[in-house]
């Protein structure tokens, strides 16, 4: 199961949170879901060069809060915040609601699977050999602290007549372990021979449940924590 399913979806509610945070009844659910898709598509197309990894959307009444996770916040914000203000107005026109935009910087782009996948796709479009592109990103990610990485390219690789999939990996990528923090990204490269799909899995370590401290245990159970009671 872990080998086939999207690792992000499998871990939602366990170690990952939802990217859309809102509630709607049956009548409005489809319309709001389509609105989310439109917002994400618009931002990705408008800020293609900014290295957008993910877009979180929160809703409350007639207000929409959009959080953009980007490797290049300067491009999104612009001089004196002009670009982000322009983006906010365009999103308000698109949705007809009050929109606030929050920019979140990605400190280490080499550990973000979506950005790594888009990087490989961009190299393939520049006619760089797919094996070289894969080995480069794998090497960079491991140097920046990844515990493991797997990159797969599928399609008419190097212009071959028959499509195939090739992959390159380093370290370990435990897809079945639900506490494993595995990031997944997918991108497409439009080459002269057709589309080439790029998939990236990055293992960033385990997310362990919060350790129960004696003080917390005492507060919940109404008992004194060890070492705190009087003689």
UniProtKB/Swiss-Prot annotation:
The keyword Zinc does not apply. GO terms for cellular component: cytosolic small ribosomal subunit. Binds the lower part of the 30S subunit head. Binds mRNA in the 70S ribosome, positioning it for translation. GO terms for biological process: translation. It comes from Pelotomaculum thermopropionicum (strain DSM 13744 / JCM 10971 / SI). Keywords: Ribonucleoprotein, Ribosomal protein, RNA-binding, rRNA-binding. The keyword Transcription regulation does not apply. InterPro entries: KH_dom, KH_dom-like_a/b, KH_dom_type_2, KH_sf_prok-type, Ribosomal_S3_C_sf, Ribosomal_uS3_bac-typ, Ribosomal_uS3_C, Ribosomal_uS3_CS. NCBIfam families: rpsC_bact. GO terms for molecular function: mRNA binding; rRNA binding; structural constituent of ribosome. This is Small ribosomal subunit protein uS3. It comes from the Bacteria. Residues 39-107 form the KH type-2 domain. Pfam families: KH_2 (PF07650), Ribosomal_S3_C (PF00189). Part of the 30S ribosomal subunit. Forms a tight complex with proteins S10 and S14. Belongs to the universal ribosomal protein uS3 family. CDD domains: KH-II_30S_S3 (cd02412).
């Amino acid at each position: 199961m872990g080998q086939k399913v999207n690792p992000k979806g499998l871990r939602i509610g366990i170690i990952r949170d939802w990217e859309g945070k809102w509630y709607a009844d049956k009548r409005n659910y489809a319309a709001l879901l389509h609105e989310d898709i439109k917002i994400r598509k618009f931002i990705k197309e408008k800020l293609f060069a900014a290295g957008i990894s993910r877009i979180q959307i929160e809703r409350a009444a007639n207000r929409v809060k959009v959080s953009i996770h980007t490797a290049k916040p300067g491009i999104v914000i612009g001089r004196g915040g002009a670009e982000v203000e322009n983006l906010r107005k365009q999103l308000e026109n698109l949705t007809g609601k009050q929109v606030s935009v929050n920019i979140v910087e990605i400190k280490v782009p080499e550990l973000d699977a979506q950005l790594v996948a888009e990087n490989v796709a961009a190299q393939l479009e520049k006619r760089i050999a797919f094996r070289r592109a894969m080995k480069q990103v794998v090497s960079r990610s491991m140097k920046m602290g990844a515990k493991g990485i797997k990159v797969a390219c599928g399609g008419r690789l190097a212009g071959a007549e028959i499509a195939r999939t090739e992959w390159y990996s380093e370290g370990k990528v435990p897809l079945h372990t639900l506490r494993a923090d595995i990031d997944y990204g997918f991108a497409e490269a439009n080459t002269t021979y057709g589309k080439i799909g790029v998939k990236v899995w990055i293992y960033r370590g385990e997310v362990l449940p919060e350790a129960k401290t004696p003080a917390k245990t005492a507060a919940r159970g109404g008992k004194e924590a060890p070492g705190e009671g009087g003689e």
